[in-house]
Curated annotation (Swiss-Prot):
Protein's name in the database: tRNA N6-adenosine threonylcarbamoyltransferase
Cysteine pairs bridged by disulfides in the record: none
Organism field: Chromohalobacter salexigens (strain ATCC BAA-138 / DSM 3043 / CIP 106854 / NCIMB 13768 / 1H11)
Co-factor note (free text): Binds 1 Fe(2+) ion per subunit.
Subcellular location: Cytoplasm
Cofactor field: Fe(2+)
UniProt: Fe cation binding residues: 111, 115, 304
GO CC field: cytoplasm
Example GO BP: tRNA threonylcarbamoyladenosine modification
Family designation: Belongs to the KAE1 / TsaD family.
Pfam families: TsaD
Length: 343
């Protein structure tokens, strides 16, 4: 089965073709990062317009790369949510229009299920069951995974997501958008002993997260230093180091608890923040101590992409899922509401 995947949930236009026999055979991505950088964040209307401009050329590109015609595909999978409603509509309407033209099914896919299963595209994918840490700009969740559509939410952020906290900390430190990679890069030069930031919600039982207080602590620290004069480059680096260590430590503590609570030995880490080198280093050490193993997507599949959508669509269709009767665009869509494929 050959499935075209379309991802347009936010600020990246991703298109890919996944073959259930050959694996990923074509993949293309257009990032809107430079366009949104001057505004310090994603502008929804601009995102939708850019998806409209870029989506069809990317579809043509992956078809050419795979040496296929549209009518040689077996299905189209598209991100139906969660995400920006206008951006979702671009992908959904394009998918349904092409599916009708090529007389093939179109299936809406949950964006976070795509991230959750992105490590399945790697050469050594994890077996079920596993614990998953989904950590991105919009989500921070721990999920117990027993199969496709068999998910149990263990914990989630009660306020800001980890990726959102990184972006806000970057603004406080006058770093460019998107903030996460810039904070991590700056943190490498920071003194780990100068500041110690709190590890929110780690002093009590449970698997929920909170990052808003950490954001406030970062702002307070920066303002205290500014009272004596402008922040130096070393001040910024030291704050970035303390912030990153606090976020990473919090995520590691909660993952450790989740593995202990479930008794599972496999940990999947996915979403944009999963690319953070310090987080991977700490989680690799933590899982090794427990005779467990951590799994990650390759770098380009940590962020939004069409490959993960094509993969999930293919798996659901193979398992008997039927195509959408109507176009779907669902800005808010809890992952825990998903169910196994039903024929």
């Amino acid at each position: 089965m050959r499935v075209l995947g379309i991802e347009t949930s936010c600020d990246e236009t991703g298109v890919a073709i996944y073959d259930t026999e050959r694996g990923l055979i074509a993949d293309a991505l257009h990032s809107q990062m430079a366009m949104h950088a001057e505004f310090g964040g994603v502008v929804p209307e601009l995102a939708s317009r850019d998806h409209t401009r870029k989506l069809l050329p990317l579809i043509r590109q992956v078809l050419d790369d795979a040496e296929l015609r549209g009518d040689q595909l077996d299905a189209i999978a598209y991100t139906a949510g969660p995400g920006l409603v206008g951006a979702l509509m671009v992908g959904a309407s394009t998918a349904h229009g092409l599916a009708r033209a090529w007389d093939i099914p179109a299936l809406g896919v949950h964006h976070m299920e795509g991230h959750l299963l992105a490590p399945m595209l790697e050469a050594a994918p994890p077996d079920f069951p596993f614990v998953a840490l989904l950590v991105s700009g919009g989500h921070t969740q721990l999920v117990e995974v027993h199969g496709l559509g068999r998910y149990r939410l263990l914990g989630e952020s009660v306020d800001d997501a980890a990726g959102e906290a990184f972006d806000k900390a970057a603004k406080m430190l006058e770093l460019p958008y998107p903030g996460g990679p810039h904070v991590a890069q700056l943190a490498e030069r920071g003194d780990p002993t100068r500041f110690r930031f709190p590890r929110p919600m780690t002093d009590r039982p449970g698997l929920d997260f909170s990052f808003s207080g950490l954001k406030t602590h970062t702002l307070t620290t920066a303002n205290q230093l500014k009272a004596a004069g402008p922040l130096s480059d070393q001040d910024r680096a030291d704050i970035a180091r303390a912030f990153e260590e606090a976020v990473v430590d919090t995520l590691v503590i909660k993952c450790r608890r989740a593995l202990d609570t479930t008794g599972l030995k496999r940990l999947v880490v996915a979403g944009g923040v999963s690319a953070n080198h310090r987080l991977r280093e700490r989680l690799d050490r933590e899982t090794a101590k427990r005779q467990a193993q951590a799994f990650y997507p390759r770098g380009r599949f940590c962020t939004d992409n069409g490959a993960m959508i094509a993969y999930v669509g293919a798996q659901r269709l193979l398992a008997g899922e039927r195509d959408d009767a109507t176009m779907q665009a669902t800005p808010r869509w809890p992952l825990a509401s998903l169910t196994p494929p039903a024929a």
